[in-house]
Amino acid sequence: MADPWNRGHGAVDDMLDAENKRMAENLASKVSRLKSLAYDIDKDAEEQNAYLDGMDSNFLSATGLLTGSVKRFSTMVRSGRDNRKILCYVSVGLVVAFFLLYYLVSRMQN
């Protein structure tokens, strides 16, 4: 005669095996989503680093340009009274150019 307990253990084992497979598939899908997320974060970080490196070189070139302009302006200021009139014209011209550019940029944004 067949033992009724053995049949019960087989059903429990099958049920536990099916639940383990379901949980393993669930875990595998979560791991795959986490891998995808980690890859996206890594790719985004690399893109941002490249962007920041480009900004660094742009700032360095702007710094060099401004340094040269300040040196030339300082030389003109120290050169004497003859250039005071030119210095005033250049200063007024720079202020006017700044406001003109500001007006044009604000006009283009609207």
Curated annotation (Swiss-Prot):
<protein>
    <recommendedName>
        <fullName>BET1-like protein</fullName>
    </recommendedName>
</protein>
<feature type="topological domain" description="Cytoplasmic">
    <location>
        <begin position="1"/>
        <end position="85"/>
    </location>
</feature>
<dbReference type="InterPro" id="IPR000727">
    <property type="entry name" value="T_SNARE_dom"/>
</dbReference>
<dbReference type="GO" id="GO:0015031">
    <property type="term" value="P:protein transport"/>
</dbReference>
<feature type="transmembrane region" description="Helical; Anchor for type IV membrane protein">
    <location>
        <begin position="86"/>
        <end position="106"/>
    </location>
</feature>
<keyword id="KW-0333">Golgi apparatus</keyword>
<keyword id="KW-0472">Membrane</keyword>
<keyword id="KW-0653">Protein transport</keyword>
<keyword id="KW-0813">Transport</keyword>
<dbReference type="GO" id="GO:2000156">
    <property type="term" value="P:regulation of retrograde vesicle-mediated transport, Golgi to ER"/>
</dbReference>
<dbReference type="GO" id="GO:0005484">
    <property type="term" value="F:SNAP receptor activity"/>
</dbReference>
<dbReference type="GO" id="GO:0031201">
    <property type="term" value="C:SNARE complex"/>
</dbReference>
<feature type="domain" description="t-SNARE coiled-coil homology">
    <location>
        <begin position="14"/>
        <end position="76"/>
    </location>
</feature>
<comment type="function">
    <text>Vesicle SNARE required for targeting and fusion of retrograde transport vesicles with the Golgi complex. Required for the integrity of the Golgi complex.</text>
</comment>
<keyword id="KW-0812">Transmembrane</keyword>
<keyword id="KW-1133">Transmembrane helix</keyword>
<feature type="topological domain" description="Lumenal">
    <location>
        <begin position="107"/>
        <end position="110"/>
    </location>
</feature>
<dbReference type="GO" id="GO:0000139">
    <property type="term" value="C:Golgi membrane"/>
</dbReference>
<keyword id="KW-0175">Coiled coil</keyword>
<dbReference type="InterPro" id="IPR039899">
    <property type="entry name" value="BET1_SNARE"/>
</dbReference>
<dbReference type="GO" id="GO:0042147">
    <property type="term" value="P:retrograde transport, endosome to Golgi"/>
</dbReference>
<comment type="subunit">
    <text>Component of a SNARE complex consisting of stx5, ykt6, gosr2 and bet1l.</text>
</comment>
<dbReference type="GO" id="GO:0005829">
    <property type="term" value="C:cytosol"/>
</dbReference>
